[in-house]
Curated annotation (Swiss-Prot):
Name this polypeptide is given: Archaeal histone B
Region of interest (Interaction with DNA), residue spans: 19-21, 53-56
Oligomer status and interactors: Homodimer or heterodimer with another histone. Dimers then assemble into higher oligomers, with the DNA wrapped around the protein core.
Gene3D superfamilies, per the entry: Histone, subunit A
Organism classification: Archaea, Methanobacteriati, Methanobacteriota, Methanomada group, Methanobacteria
Interaction with DNA (site feature) positions: 13
Alphabetized Pfam families for the sequence: CBFD_NFYB_HMF
Length: 67
């Protein structure tokens, strides 16, 4: 999965950067994808533990807190 690069650039600019290189966009996108997959994996475990097949927002929120 690849996150769209334009929103990644906006995230960096919203953090205060005036200009953002393509390499910086790609590096942040990769980091976010890796972290997102880790969070999603934990959220799936939480849903399964609760006896559900559906991952809820509360599973994701708890996964973020636990990691």
């Amino acid at each position: 999965m690849e996150l769209p690069i334009a929103p990644i650039g906006r995230i960096i600019k919203n953090a205060g950067a005036e200009r953002v290189s393509d390499d910086a966009r790609e590096a942040l996108a990769k980091a976010l994808e890796e972290k997102g997959e880790t969070i999603a994996t934990e959220a799936v475990k939480l849903a399964k533990h609760a006896g559900r097949k559906t991952v809820k927002a509360s599973d994701v929120e708890l996964a973020v807190k636990r990691l």
